[in-house]
């Protein structure tokens, strides 16, 4: 093996020394009446690095003195196998931010603990874990759109995933959950996701890509909750006030005057041009994976271009 940044391989003696001198092992023995999950939680105060997900898992299982094994096997383990540790933490934050747009990802454990403090019995705790699993399956589809069954929704999810921003995650998960509960169908979901995609693209072309984007989309998530037609509600919300959802006329003007080559992120500019190219439906599509933007022409518009 090689040490980080080292070109020479480590010797067996160096590996042995690192393990013997640098590795600490903690052994905890529990009795019949001990709560292993409570003991695990307390380890966070002894210098061991526990994630927000670790703490939340153990908080939940502390509330399951008689059903922990069944809930772990049937609900938590499938969730844990579905998502990585980082994805799990994000899921728990996405769940919290639906109700509190200001909650930070460092506050996941405390926030979820407050949210669940009124749970009365093990059946209610089990229901929470079951709900997390349902949300986890939706989040998994968001991250891996190829798993989505509906073609139109799959296409829109893939577009948002290609944009590579987490700012759309809260509202997308909310919309996905609304469909899973039967509040909206796949056509309505696809339409809402199209508005979301259009909002991202229009802001970039109009030159206002980063201005308050995260705050706006978190507020939109709260605004459309409970509304019968979340797609129309989303469009109304994004089109109101100073949210920079550029109109068609504004986009036409921006295309002629805005410095596209220097607007937003390079990856997003390339993506927009790629989507335009793909919209023509060429019988011989060009492989654009390795393409780069060298020039945006013409640099000066004349009447012939307009």
Cite the ranges covered by each PLM segment.
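Flexible loop/turn segments at secondary-structure boundaries
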Residues: 32-36, 47, 63, 282, ...
């Amino acid at each position: 093996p090689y040490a980080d940044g080292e070109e020479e391989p480590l010797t067996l003696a160096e590996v042995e020394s690192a393990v013997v001198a640098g590795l600490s092992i903690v052994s905890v023995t529990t009795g019949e009446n001990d709560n292993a999950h409570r003991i695990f939680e307390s380890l966070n105060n002894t210098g061991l690095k526990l994630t927000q997900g670790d703490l939340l898992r153990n908080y939940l299982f502390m509330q399951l003195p008689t059903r922990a094994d069944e809930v772990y096997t049937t609900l938590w383990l499938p969730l844990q196998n579905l998502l990585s540790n980082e994805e799990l933490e994000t899921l728990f934050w996405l769940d919290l931010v639906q109700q509190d747009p200001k909650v930070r990802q460092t506050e996941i454990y405390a926030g979820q603990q407050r949210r669940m403090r009124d749970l009365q019995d093990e059946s209610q705790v089990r229901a929470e874990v079951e709900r997390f699993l349902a949300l986890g399956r939706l989040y998994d589809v968001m991250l891996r759109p190829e798993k989505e069954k509906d073609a139109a929704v799959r296409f829109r999810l893939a577009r948002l995933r290609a944009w590579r921003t987490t700012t759309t995650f809260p509202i997308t998960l909310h919309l996905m959950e609304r469909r899973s509960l039967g509040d909206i169908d796949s056509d309505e979901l696809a339409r809402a996701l199209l508005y979301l995609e259009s909002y991202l693209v229009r802001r970039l072309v109009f030159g206002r890509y980063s201005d308050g984007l995260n705050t706006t989309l978190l507020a939109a998530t709260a605004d459309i909750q409970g509304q019968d037609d979340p797609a129309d509600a989303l469009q109304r919300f994004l089109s109101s006030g100073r949210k920079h959802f550029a109109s068609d006329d504004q986009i036409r003007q921006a295309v002629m005057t805005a410095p596209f080559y220097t607007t937003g992120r390079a990856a997003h500019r390339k993506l927009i041009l790629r989507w335009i190219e793909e919209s023509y439906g060429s019988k011989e599509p060009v492989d654009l994976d390795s393409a780069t933007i060298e020039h945006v022409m013409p640099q000066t518009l004349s009447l012939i271009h307009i």
